């Protein structure tokens, strides 16, 4: 019994490391000059919340919890407000779609402690004249994880259980289309704002937002450094996996 419990803990640890590995490279691409939107859906209550940031700048906050809606930072350029206003209705529509999907998704209630809650992160880097694309990360009750890359129309799950849910969601053509084209209508405004945020000197007196989980340093001028950062993250996680397997032996 004791050996089985230890083995179970090792499998759980390895699974978590694999989840980190799954998202390591994507997180390496998220920086101070990408648009990041965090969506929180708490089924079955009507509680939805959306926060969109560019680095430390909050450009949009939607909440039906306390009925608040803010768009843009008064201390920043008018472009931030324009981006927030452009994204407002598409994100509201997406929240409703996500609410319907998570409410109709069968999950292990022992893992979710009842009704599942959904956290979604959308990361949009400047398109630089190319077709606008984004990365969508889905987290259901910290138990089911999968990612959708609109640029290559590719889905990736963290484990088999997550894959079952992911496959059902990706078979919804209207939902996939909604994810892919949500940012297209606002891409010109977003690119202009991201370009300005790169050119604007960063304040040294401002405390970073708690939602900014990655480095707040400016985006390097080439993609090589970004790729290097992603691969370093993957390498560190791979080393952790080796230790996990060694302890499991």
From Swiss-Prot:
Residues in coiled coil: none
Prosequence residues removed at maturation: 226-249
Modified how: Glycosylated.
UniProt keyword annotations, A-Z: Cell membrane, Disulfide bond, Glycoprotein, GPI-anchor, Lipoprotein, Membrane, Signal
Region (Disordered): 194-227
Glycan attachment residues as annotated in the record: 38, 66, 79, 139
Annotated signal sequence range: 1-28
Induction (free text): By retinoic acid.
Residues with a covalently attached lipid (GPI-anchor amidated serine): 225
Pfam families the UniProt entry points to: MHC_I_2
Its membrane topology: Lipid-anchor; GPI-anchor
UniProt GO cellular component terms: external side of plasma membrane; plasma membrane
Biased composition (Low complexity): 207-225
Compartments it resides in: Cell membrane
Main localization, broad class: membrane
Any one biological process term the GO annotation gives: natural killer cell mediated cytotoxicity
MF terms in GO: natural killer cell lectin-like receptor binding
Taxonomic superkingdom: Eukaryota
Disulfide bonding pattern of the chain: 37-52, 86-186
InterPro entries given in the database record: MHC_class-I_related (IPR050208), MHC_I-like_Ag-recog_sf (IPR037055), MHC_I/II-like_Ag-recog (IPR011162), RAE-1 (IPR029287)
Function field: Acts as a ligand for KLRK1.
Family to which this protein belongs: Belongs to the NKG2D ligand family.
Name of the featured protein: Retinoic acid early-inducible protein 1-delta
Primary gene name: Raet1d
């Amino acid at each position: 019994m004791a050996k089985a419990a230890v083995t179970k803990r090792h499998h759980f640890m390895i699974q978590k490391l694999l989840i980190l590995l799954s998202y390591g490279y994507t997180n390496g691409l998220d920086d101070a000059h990408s648009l990041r939107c965090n969506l929180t859906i708490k089924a079955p209550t009507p509680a939805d919340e959306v926060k969109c940031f560019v680095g430390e700048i909050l450009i949009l906050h939607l909440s039906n919890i306390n009925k608040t809606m803010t768009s843009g930072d008064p201390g920043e350029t008018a472009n931030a407000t324009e981006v927030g206003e452009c994204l407002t209705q598409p994100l509201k529509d997406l929240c409703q779609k996500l609410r319907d999907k998570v409410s109709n998704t069968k999950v292990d209630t022992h893992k979710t402690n009842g009704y599942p809650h959904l956290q979604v992160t959308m990361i949009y880097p400047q398109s630089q004249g190319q077709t606008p694309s984004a990365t969508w990360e889905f987290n259901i009750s910290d138990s089911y994880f999968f990612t959708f890359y609109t640029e290559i129309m590719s889905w990736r799950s963290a484990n088999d259980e997550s894959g079952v849910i992911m496959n059902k969601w990706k078979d919804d053509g209207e939902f996939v289309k909604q994810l892919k084209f949500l940012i297209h209508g606002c891409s010109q405004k977003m690119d202009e704002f991201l370009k300005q945020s790169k050119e604007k000197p960063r304040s040294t007196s401002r405390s970073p937002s708690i939602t900014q989980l990655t480095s707040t340093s400016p985006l390097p001028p080439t993609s090589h450094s970004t790729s290097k950062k992603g691969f370093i993250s993957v390498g560190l996680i791979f080393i952790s996996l080796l230790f996990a397997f060694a302890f499991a032996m």
